[in-house]
Amino acid sequence: MSKTLQSFNLLKWIDENKELLKPPVNNKVIWQDSEFIAMILGGPNRRRDFHVDPSDEFFYQIKGECYVECITEEGKREVVTVKEGDVFMLPAMVPHSPHRVANTYGLVIERKRSQGELEDFVWFCDECNHEMHRVRVQLSDIEKQVKEAIHSFNSNKEIRACKNCGHIMPEEVEEWKCE
């Protein structure tokens, strides 16, 4: 199989493909035939899950700011602001929730998963930080599977109810507001 050896203008690609960047995740993979997952993500996204990826993730913020909410080893939430033009390398296995506001774009690169390599999508209570729900997947289609996991959580009131404090997370996710 021959691969195309050609560059292209990424900003033009983003402009021509904006309609593909839809909530909740707003992601579009650029190349299907690579050993990397290279995708453009736009804002505003509508997600509150924390992704636990077995590989590092490279963030390059093209326009605006991205807020990567991370869970530290001590269990605390910490927000990393990735400003326009900045890069950020997120280490493997750090639970993180990338938040994008309107009219922002970024590039995220991570490696494709090996057969049998699993990763998690985790939801924590907004009130007490208790783990509410966890989905473990063999990731093969990042555009499809992340949306399915988010939809499954949002549409099920039982798993949106915290068993620790009783808080019920709303079905609809509002745009991120950095506090």
Swiss-Prot record:
Cofactor(s), by name: Fe(2+)
Query: For this protein, what reaction is catalysed?
Result: 3-hydroxyanthranilate + O2 = (2Z,4Z)-2-amino-3-carboxymuconate 6-semialdehyde
Q: Where does O2 bind?
A: R47
Q: Which InterPro entries match?
A: 3hydroanth_dOase, RmlC-like_jellyroll, RmlC_Cupin_sf
> What Pfam families does UniProt report for this protein, alphabetically?
3-HAO (PF06052)
Task: Give the record's cofactor note, including how many are bound.
Answer: Binds 2 Fe(2+) ions per subunit.
**Which GO molecular function annotation, any one, does this entry have?**
3-hydroxyanthranilate 3,4-dioxygenase activity
One GO cellular component from the entry? cytoplasm
Q: Which residues bind substrate?
A: E57, R100, E110
Q: What is its EC number?
A: 1.13.11.6
CDD domains per the record?
A: cupin_HAO (cd06123)
Q: Which Gene3D superfamilies match?
A: Jelly Rolls (2.60.120.10)
Its UniProt pathway annotation is:
Cofactor biosynthesis; NAD(+) biosynthesis; quinolinate from L-kynurenine: step 3/3
Q: Which GO terms describe its biological process?
A: anthranilate metabolic process; L-tryptophan catabolic process; NAD biosynthetic process; quinolinate biosynthetic process
Q: Which UniProt keywords apply?
A: Dioxygenase, Iron, Metal-binding, Oxidoreductase, Pyridine nucleotide biosynthesis
Residues annotated as binding Fe cation 1: H51, E57, H96
Instruction: Give residues annotated as binding Fe cation 2.
Output: C125, C128, C162, C165
Query: What family is this?
Result: Belongs to the 3-HAO family.
Q: NCBIfam families in the record, alphabetically? A: anthran_nbaC, PRK13264.1
* UniProt function note: Catalyzes the oxidative ring opening of 3-hydroxyanthranilate to 2-amino-3-carboxymuconate semialdehyde, which spontaneously cyclizes to quinolinate.
- What is this protein called in UniProt? 3-hydroxyanthranilate 3,4-dioxygenase
Gene name tied to this protein? nbaC
